[in-house]
Every structure is written in structure tokens, then in C-alpha cells.
Amino acid sequence: MKRRQFVTSIAAGLGVAALPGRLRATATPRPLKLLILGGTGFLGPHTVEYALARGHEVTLFNRGKTNLGLFPDLETIIGDRDPEVNSGLSGLEGRQWDAVIDNSGYVPRMVGASASLLAGNVGQYVFVSTICQYEDWIEGGTFGTEERPRAVLEDPATEDISQYYCELKAYCERAVEDAIPDRATFVRPGLIVGPLDRSDRYTYWPVRMARGGEVLAPGKPGDLTQYIDVRDLAQFLVHCVEQGHIGAYNAVCNPRPWGSFLAATRDAVNPDAKLTWVPAGFLAEHDVQPWNDVHMWADADSPMAGSLAWSADKAIAAGLAFRPAAETARDTLAWFETLPPKRREQLRAGMNPEKEAAVLAAWHEREGA
């Protein structure tokens, strides 16, 4: 798969469980006034819940269209990220907050507008970016760090998120820097997973393990994967505000063996499921593609491997911590099982059962099993 296909896959996934404390223990903070741009989608509710649990005062800014009534007791300012649409950002004028957490910014023009308007009224601007905003990923087994250059576009004025999601996030970061150069925090998550994720890119795995039987495991156990539980990310965002962390942070677990991830997921939800490892070359012959048919995996010998090989050392040193893979698997499956039956029958990612069975049958035939 080419980088452009990977970017398209990430963009396609754009879219409240208990929040046990996993972040490194810190003293109870002084209450802060926080503004969250968004707050009612996937990452937002987890961030709001954790901020409230920490004693902070939260104000939401959104269009009032997603999950209405989710936080009825919170002040919600209705507006639009686009300053040219209806009242735009006018509801934020003249207000002051200790920090803003921007988890709904995708277009540099709009992010620049909010950062410029709030520059004199917030102490810190935390922007949720993406690990794919880098110019390119590292190849050859070296873990990429925050010093890698950002992506560039031939046409920086484009607002085509479906084609240039990653690059536009890089320009969003630049827009925040231009407005608030010394008080900006860029949190760069990889694949965000867990309860409320509507993309199913991760969810496919616990759901598939729970179904049982023979499960196609792509590649080799030693290939790498990376992700972050949405609740761990939410806690880190609030932690960055409480601690005043400025700068860029890769927010992913450090690369872990693909085999241990699949085994942990299986053991958490259905230890009787059987993993059958099928090499990358055979999968390619049968049109099984990473980040298309199977998510969270790339062959260690392919150029795509660098997409799952980023260093999180800086964020970990700043306080980012991770819950066990088994907990993420169990909680995600429990949430998924609360969805309507028709939705549960229509996974939005991963191989359908017929294709998986056909590839496994072909593999066994080749191996003489």
C-alpha cells in the first residue's frame, strides 16, 4: 500500500466508558477553566469525563449536532469552526480560559482562526494532531521521533481532508504556532482505539476473536504494531494542561510485536480462537492489503513498516501511560455489544468472513494441510 492509500484509510476513520486512572499518579491539580473544541464525538467525551473527574471546569464549543444532551450540565457554546459560516467563532470572543484542547481541527484556515482569536485569552493551546503529519515515516527499523520534518503540500490552500488529512494536520500545527508560538502543545496520536470508535479498524480484532474458530493472522509474529487507547490519550491531554507541557509529543504505545498484540487480544476475549499465520507474500497474491483488508499491521520488510514504528519516549517521560491490551480489548468488545444488532453485523473494517475463509483455505491447500 502506498502512503496515499494509508492517508485515505486514516481519514475514513474520522468520526462513555469508565475511566480508570492509568496516568502516572500526580497530585490533585488546582481547578482549571478548560475550553474543548468539539467534545461530543469519540475522543471528546473521554476527555471531558476525565477533566471533570480531575475537578476542572469545562466549556464545550461545537455545532450542537452530535450526541445532543451528552453533557447537559456543561456550558456549551454553539458555533462553527469555520468563521465564515453563520456565527462562526463569535461566541468565543471576550472569554478567557486557562487552556483550550482542540480535538476537532482538520483545516488550517479554521484552526488558524480559532488560535488567533484565542491567543490573548488562553494560557495554552493543546492541538490534537496525528502521527502521520510527518513528511514521511522512517524505514529500516529506526523509530521516528518528534524531530522528523512535517509534511508539505504543493497547494497549501487545499481543504480536501479526504485526500490530504495528514498533510493538513501538519499545516494546522503551523497555524497554531503562528498564532501562539510559545504556548502550543501538539499531541500526535497514532491509531486511536477503544470504546466509542466507529471506524472498526481496531474493533475488528476483538470482535473477530470473540467469534472464535480459525482466525487469519497476517504476516509474522515479529512484525510491529502501534496504537493508543482513547482513554489513555484523553488523560494525557488533560495531563499536558495540568503540567504545562509545551511542544510536540508522539502519543502512541511504543512499537510492540504483532504476535503478542493478537495473542493478548485473543486471550482477553476468547482463548479458544486459533491464530493461523499467513505470510505477507501469500496475502498479496490474494489481494489482502494492509490498512485495507487488515488494519494495524504492516509487513516488517515493507516500506509501510515505518507507519507503525514511532518513538513515544518523549511522551512517556512526560507522563503518558498505557493500560494493558487485554483491558482495551475487553472494554471495546463490551461497548460494541451494546450497539444495535444490525450495526454489529456490519463491521466497517477488516476482512469479511467469506474472504477470510477463502484465503485460509487457499493457504492450507498450498501447505498441504
Feature map (PLM): residue ranges:
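N-terminal export signals
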Residues: R4-A25
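N-terminal Rossmann NAD(P)H-binding glycine-rich loop of SDR-like oxidoreductase domains
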Residues: L37-R54
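N-terminal Rossmann-fold cofactor-binding loop
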Residues: F61-K65
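Conserved beta-loop-beta element that borders a ligand/cofactor-binding pocket
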Residues: S129, C172-L196
